[in-house]
Swiss-Prot record:
PROSITE patterns: KARI_C, KARI_N. NADP(+) binds at residues 25-28, 48, 52, 82-85, 133. The keyword Ribonucleoprotein does not apply. It comes from Oceanobacillus iheyensis (strain DSM 14371 / CIP 107618 / JCM 11309 / KCTC 3954 / HTE831). Involved in the biosynthesis of branched-chain amino acids (BCAA). Catalyzes an alkyl-migration followed by a ketol-acid reduction of (S)-2-acetolactate (S2AL) to yield (R)-2,3-dihydroxy-isovalerate. In the isomerase reaction, S2AL is rearranged via a Mg-dependent methyl migration to produce 3-hydroxy-3-methyl-2-ketobutyrate (HMKB). In the reductase reaction, this 2-ketoacid undergoes a metal-dependent reduction by NADPH to yield (R)-2,3-dihydroxy-isovalerate. InterPro entries: 6-PGluconate_DH-like_C_sf, KARI, KARI_C, KARI_N, KARI_prok, NAD(P)-bd_dom_sf. This is Ketol-acid reductoisomerase (NADP(+)). Belongs to the ketol-acid reductoisomerase family. Substrate binds at residue 251.
Length: 344
């Protein structure tokens, strides 16, 4: 059984006199920077000019270029999208690291797949909150926190684990519990969860259910409610108390259907395909494909994204959500094509 550490288990003195540079001010970046500052740490934010810089300055931070922030800091937390990190590291961080500094990530992708290769004379660790940035910030302000994983890739100073734990405590994660992992485990399990279950698996299941009902002549609006809209009700029950809580809360008819039909949808062949997905992740095949896709300007990514946004379930969903004012509207209901922009 994995050991979970809490605030009482962590000594944070090792981080108290260090300056922390948070590179990036998006969902995780703003939460880490604000929580660390509220915990009493000296925080500087590294960004290029733009809206994020304006927001960070409005929030009271000293905002510098990535290079300047990295050169001033003892601990450099990189909270940029995976695909941006290698170039930013090479151009703005690498030459500004000093002996004994700590290079930190919230996801192990670029270290594990050697897209970022740090010098041998720095510590390298990860602190990965298991929740979005807005939740990391909100729970911190409420006196709670979001659990996190931490792991050490390189321990030059002999203090990497202690600094990682202190950082976890600083962002509020130790209030909820921190669990030790490795860069390999965090990266491979995170990618698998996204692809096979949380994102790829769920979206494909929802679309297949919707298409099955509409192909059989049922109204698209009804199919939307049954296969997508009600998903939140079930997920909330799972989140609160696992499978048992969900099954306790639904009708006996629904539970019996779960027992006899669920295994017909996800069977041994599905599990074999999941193993194939995991193998692609473990061998680096997925990472290689994603890296090459970005280098080519994301032609497949953008084409698939446009096609998915035109799926009938999206059209029906947008129309129905306009009739439901109680449903929080998305910030960007129609995702635009994505190109990689690198900060200075």
């Amino acid at each position: 059984m994995a050991k979970v550490l809490y605030e009482k288990d962590i000594q944070d003195g090792v981080l108290k006199n260090k300056k922390i540079a948070v590179i990036g001010y998006g969902s995780q970046g703003h939460a880490h920077a604000m929580n660390l500052r509220d915990s009493g740490y000296d925080v500087v934010v590294g960004l290029r000019p733009g809206k994020s810089q304006e927001k960070a300055e409005e929030d009271g931070f000293n905002v510098l270029s990535v290079a300047e922030a990295s050169s001033q800091a003892d601990v450099v937390m990189v909270l940029l999208p995976d695909e941006m990190q290698p170039k930013v590291y090479e151009e703005s961080i690498k030459d500004n690291l000093e002996q004994g500094n700590a290079l930190v990530f919230a996801h192990g992708f670029n270290i594990h797949f050697t897209q970022v290769v740090p010098p041998a004379n720095v510590d390298v660790f990860l602190v990965a909150p298991k929740g979005p940035g807005h939740l990391v910030r909100r729970t911190f302000e409420e006196g709670a926190g979001v659990p996190a994983l931490y792991g050490v890739h390189q321990d030059y100073t002999g203090e990497a684990k202690d600094v990682a734990l202190a950082y976890s405590k600083g962002i509020g994660a130790a209030r909820a519990g921190v669990l030790e992992t490795s860069f390999q485990e965090e990266t491979e399990t995170d990618l698998f969860g996204e692809q096979a279950v949380l994102c790829g698996g769920v979206t494909s299941l929802i679309k297949a259910g919707f298409e099955t009902l509409t192909d059989a002549g049922y109204q698209p609006e009804v199919a939307y409610f049954e296969c997508l809209h009600e998903m939140k009700l079930i997920v909330d029950l799972l989140y609160e108390g696992g499978l048992e809580n969900m099954r306790y809360s639904i009708s006996d008819t629904a539970q019996w259907g779960d027992f006899v039909s669920g295994q017909r949808v996800v069977d041994d062949q599905t599990k074999e395909r999941m193993k194939s997905i995991l193998d692609d992740i473990q061998t680096g095949s997925f990472a290689k494909g994603w890296i090459l896709e970005n280098q080519a300007g994301r032609p497949q990514f953008n084409a698939i994204n446009r096609r998915e946004n035109r799926h009938p379930i999206e059209t029906v969903g947008r129309e129905l959500r306009e009739l439901m004012p109680f449903v929080k509207q998305p910030i960007n209901a129609k995702k635009k094509d994505v190109n990689v922009h690198v900060p200075n």
